[in-house]
């Protein structure tokens, strides 16, 4: 418990004055128990202005089968999940167990041909106020520039390319952008899905479209079609 509390106290004291911090996390994929609850209680006592989440709380060590088995263990303010399916999110948000808002602290793993199902997730998010957002894992491929290849293209090393052992092969290459921050196709898809102005075809033959404004404080009159 002392080690967990020490890390959380340092985390809060370091970042408490940063306005971009809207929520405290108790860690990542590190089990759950009374030590976690102790960290949650300390954090809420130190800073009562922000929510607290921990993905490990509702799982109770991963033991659950369906929406009717959701139990809120401990004192997390939100139902925080990783990689729950879009139908699962919809079912929770519409169930009698949805006593706390839901958040996907990880979803749509951007590895290989990913991320996928972005539109399906955001259809659920936009239609359910108690599902307040989701975070793609992850932003950037973890590799380093190793000069240019013979064809002139940049060469990036990862997963044992430098002879390091052990390694995780290509599991670190799972970002929305490349190491030099060039967008992958997944980032372009995500941008289209979460764009604040939506245009949908109603009747193409008649030239009818539905325009939806998802901005909170901006009118569409400032834009040109």
Task: Give the residues covered by each predicted segment.
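Extended substrate-binding grooves/exosites of carbohydrate-active enzymes
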Residues: 1-210, 215-221
């Amino acid at each position: 418990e002392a080690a967990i509390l020490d890390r959380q106290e340092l985390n809060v004291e370091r970042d408490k004055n940063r306005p971009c911090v809207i929520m405290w996390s108790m860690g990542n994929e590190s089990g759950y128990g009374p030590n976690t609850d102790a960290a949650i209680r300390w954090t809420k006592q130190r800073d009562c202005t922000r929510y607290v989440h921990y993905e490990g709380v509702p799982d109770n060590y991963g033991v659950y089968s369906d929406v009717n088995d959701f139990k809120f263990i401990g004192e997390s303010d939100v139902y925080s999940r990783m990689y729950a399916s879009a139908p699962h999110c919809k079912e929770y948000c519409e169930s009698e167990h949805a006593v706390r808002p839901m958040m996907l602290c990880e979803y749509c793993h951007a590895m290989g041909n990913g991320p996928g199902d972005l539109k399906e997730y955001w259809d659920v998010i936009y239609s359910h106020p108690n599902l307040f957002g989701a975070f793609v894992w992850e932003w950037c491929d973890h590799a380093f520039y190793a000069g240019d290849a013979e064809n002139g293209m940049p060469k990036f090393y990862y997963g044992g390319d430098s002879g390091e052992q052990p390694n995780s092969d290509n599991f670190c290459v799972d970002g929305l952008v490349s190491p030099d921050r060039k967008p992958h196709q997944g980032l372009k898809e995500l941008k289209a899905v979460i764009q604040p102005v939506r245009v949908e075809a109603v009747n193409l033959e008649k030239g009818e479209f539905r325009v939806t404004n998802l901005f909170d404080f901006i009118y569409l009159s400032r834009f040109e079609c």
